[in-house]
Amino acid sequence: MLRIIDTETCGLQGGIVEIASVDVVDGKIVNPMSHLVRPDRPISPQAMAIHRITEAMVADKPWIEDVIPQYYGSEWYVAHNASFDRRVLPDMPGEWICTMKLSRRLWPGIKYSNMALYKSRKLSVQTPAGLHHHRALYDCYITAALLIDIMQTSGWTADQMVDITGRPALLTTFTFGKYRGKPVSEVAERDPGYLRWLFNNLD
């Protein structure tokens, strides 16, 4: 069983306002769970515009420390951009898998947000009624569908996905400089001197 976790926050620095999870068991999405959470700071207007969770909606909700034990119980936790969720959550007893890192390994060059990958891979999943993208439970279903696709495409085991998640991300496409948007492999063939220059000028 792999447990997909998603959080919505007060902003990029954290402050959880919502947590949710679903489990993937034998390729099926089961056991949905979600909680609104009272944050430890004000919700930024930018974050509120994205997830539409207001101060009034969370004012009387429990703290994250009070609800997080309900999300324990898996050997593996999965998130899209797992480093963010790991940073804002209390410690979770298990290994972490990042679908963003796995997707970059499998499909370099595709936009890496979970919704962009979901659409480009032409995936389909029944999401909860009344929710929308950037609500935690909705996004858990999107990430779960992506995880199932990754596992079916790659054949990777959970432990292999943990290993890949722990490795430094490989640059497959230049995001800077005169070759911005070009695959590294193409530049290596056409202009190997540029790669040598880059390596020699790394700080």
PLM segments and residue spans:
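Short, surface-exposed, low-complexity cationic segments
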Residues: 186-203
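Metal-dependent phosphoesterase core characteristic of DEDDh/y 3'-5' exonuclease domains
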Residues: 2, 12-19, 23-53, 72-182
